[in-house]
């Protein structure tokens, strides 16, 4: 996915969020915090993942630092997330907005968290990768080993109970 295509996906998400906030004022602060205050998809993703996966052991701010470190080192993860958003938007008839996976779909969240764990695993930070895998499993009921290999443009529909082992590939 080119930078231009990534910008198109992000601009669609922000436009949808503005419309959604106008249509449902009770959720306006939610849309602002999760999407509208962020400059790019990576920032929104890091905010969302950090808040979903935080725990007393690892607060959201610490998780967000790790996610942002990974995105800075490998921006292709953000492009992969945009491809995943497009895949969900194209393949799932129940999804009519680009913002839906980012806001609500735990399969999408689990997949993006896996990408961070996979990066950590490949950096030799295996303890943190396994910790993150466990948080994903507890939070989303999705268990993807950080050593697994997963491509882009992936949709994990509903996602509950999905298990991908360390020697598996999903393309």
Q: What is the predicted function of each stretch?
A:
Residues 133-165:
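A mid-sequence, solvent-exposed acidic-amphipathic segment
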């Amino acid at each position: 996915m080119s930078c231009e295509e990534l910008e198109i996906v992000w601009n669609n998400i922000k436009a949808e969020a503005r419309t959604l906030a106008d249509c449902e004022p009770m959720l306006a602060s939610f849309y602002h915090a999760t999407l509208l205050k962020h400059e790019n998809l990576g920032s929104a993703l890091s905010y969302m993942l950090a808040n979903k996966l935080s725990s007393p052991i690892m607060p959201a701010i610490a998780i967000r630092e790790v996610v942002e470190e990974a995105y800075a080192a490998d921006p292709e993860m953000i492009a992969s997330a945009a491809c995943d958003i497009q895949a969900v938007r194209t393949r799932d008839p129940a999804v009519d907005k680009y913002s839906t996976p980012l806001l609500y779909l735990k399969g999408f969240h689990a997949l993006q968290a896996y990408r961070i764990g996979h990066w950590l695993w490949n950096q030799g930070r295996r303890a943190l990768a396994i910790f993150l895998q466990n948080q994903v499993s507890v939070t989303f009921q999705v268990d993807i080993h950080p050593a697994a290999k997963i491509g882009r443009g992936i949709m994990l529909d509903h996602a509950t109970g999905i298990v991908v082992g360390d020697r598996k590939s999903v393309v």
